[in-house]
Amino acid sequence: MKTTKIYDIIGIGIGPFNLGLAALSAPIADLDTLFLDQSDEFNWHPGLMLDEVTLQVPFMADLVTMADPASQYSFLNYMKLTGRLYKFYIRENFFIFRKEYNAYCKWVLGQLNNCLFSRQVVSVTYEDAVYRVTARDTRSGETNTWQTYKLVLGTGTSPYIPAAIKEKSLKDVIHTSQYLNHKDRLVQKQSVTIIGSGQSAAEIFQDLLPEVKKGMKLNWFTRSERFFPLENHTKLTLELTSPDYIDYFHNLPEVQRKYVLSRQSILFKGINADLINQIYNSLYAMGLNDEAHKVVLMANARLNDIQEEDESYLLTFLQVEQGETFDINTDAVILATGYKYVEPDFLTGISDRIRRLDDGNYDVRRNYTIDETCNEIFVQNAELHTHGISTPDLGMGAYRNSQIINQVTGRIVYAVEQRIAFQSFSAADLPVHLKSAVDLTL
């Protein structure tokens, strides 16, 4: 079925970023939007929905607050209307539970009428100045086509599993994103090995530590030089997730951007320092009961190979600094290998309208567009290489959505802050009195 109606925006994918865009768009009478997602319902990282695990950003990083603090879709309004605001106030903690954030997002969805789930987009074409988005209803099999002037791509990132491992299809080798789906089976194993050193790896390690008392041998290896703490909670470092720094980073040459990003991974891929301390305290307590010997932690250990052996796996590592290889046996492997953006296949029909850099990545302009006109195809969380470490940050989602809405409507619907950082990033931004010409006659 094809509709004749033309939307102002069709968003593909309904994660937190496009959901925030849907919520911020809802009150705008002259902005007609539709959002599609292939999942049956909204569920944010269900495989990592561990009890008492919190977001790494304050609650103001909800779907709308940083764009419109008075929005009916704010987290504080959610708490008020669900009768939990005073409990939240007494708790005195800016960092909300991940389960709480997921419930909040579902609450917002329940008030919107511009989001459709179970719709798998199969193609996008361009004709007569409009984009045609065709999606299949995953429940009925029916196909529908909608038309729009603008696209917002919010399909997000996908779990990354190295190709050499993925092609082997090993039963008890899973990605962290699927942890809770397999936990019942994992806790029955005699030995489990976690590979990787980010927040998810640490959360799962801490979650499995109690199983050591029941006999499990638990290993944690990472190729990183150490188990790095997340270093973005100091105030001046947090200014790297600001409009000021996005401007600075975006204006750097492509080669320089790659270099800078390679040095900033611990700013968004490290482990919460409190969690590291909790893990150490748990290990210390286990040592009192002579149980710590069942736990192995090692940095500088790169996984080189994995082979299936009967009901277990033989893992071959390289100790990077020593240049020595070693093998271990384990019954299960949990890969904390992160996430990567995968370009959707449905973009093939409009590939001629998308700008690219020399390496094939999107050439994302400062206003988050990737099309030749710089005004039609926007991206969410696909611009790490052009906009820097603020890209996956929930706290910057409302800022990016404000930019998109203002661009699409041609007016300032949501005020956007220009300068918020105390520090200067570019030499051109230094105060005038510091750049006075030197008097060469002295």
Residue ranges and their predicted role:
Residues M1-D40, W44-P46, F88-Q199, E203-L442:
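Flavin (primarily FAD) cofactor-binding/catalytic cores of flavoenzymes
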Residues W44-L48, Q56-M79:
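Redox-cofactor-proximal catalytic regions of oxidoreductases
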Residues M66-K99:
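A conserved beta-strand/loop capping segment in the N-terminal third of enzymes
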